[in-house]
Every structure is written in C-alpha cells, then in structure tokens.
C-alpha cells in the first residue's frame, strides 16, 4: 500500500532533501513483527539511507527520540486515516505511542 504519511516519495521524510543527494530507503515505521502491518496500513516513509535511516546521529535506527516521534506521528495519521481510537490502534500495533 502507498504511504498514508508521505506523498512525496522523492524527498526524505526527516530532512526534506531530495533523494539524489543520497539514495532513499523505504522505512517501515513499526518494524520487526509489525513490518507487514506497517506495509498493509501504509505506515511507511522514505529516508536517506545513511544519514536519516541507519547511521546518522539523528537517524531513526540510532536515535530513539526521533524514532518515537515518528511512531507517534504515524499513530496519529493511522487513527485519523482509519477512524481508529487509541484502543483500535493498540489492537493492531499492541502499544500506544502517543
């Protein structure tokens, strides 16, 4: 499914720069066992591979604060998009990130 969070898949969701600066990766906001649900519900964003996704100081995989902010933002988007309550979201993703 297309992302319900990000329309412009040619720009990094975190820094806003175009992908030609560095390749973009599709990041599933809720990973691990919830990766398929992230895909199913469109909870994905595009991030610069090194700087914003994996290795940078402010990348989602190295900076827990940034990752949690993205998860909270994605939860709000999902609740708005699907008309879910917090309880509905927890039924799908097992946790409240707000």
Q: Would you name each region that the model predicts?
A:
Residues 71-98:
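Short flanking/linker segments adjacent to small metal-binding domains or redox-active Cys/His motifs
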Residues 24-32, 49-55:
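Histidine-centered catalytic micro-motifs
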Residues 44-69:
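Short Cys/His-centered divalent metal-binding micro-motifs
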Residues 1-7, 65, 96-98:
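Short, Lys/Arg-enriched, disordered terminal segments
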Residues 33, 64, 72:
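Small/polar glycine-rich anion-binding or flexible loop at a beta-alpha turn
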């Amino acid at each position: 499914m297309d992302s319900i969070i990000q329309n412009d898949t040619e720009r990094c969701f975190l820094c806003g720069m175009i992908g030609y600066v560095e390749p973009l990766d599709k990041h599933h906001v809720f990973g691990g066992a919830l990766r398929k649900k992230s895909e199913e519900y469109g909870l994905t964003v595009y991030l610069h591979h090194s700087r914003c996704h994996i290795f940078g100081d402010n990348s989602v995989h190295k900076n827990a604060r940034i990752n949690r902010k993205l998860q909270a933002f994605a939860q709000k988007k999902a609740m708005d998009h699907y008309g879910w309550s917090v309880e509905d979201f927890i039924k799908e993703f097992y946790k409240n990130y707000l």
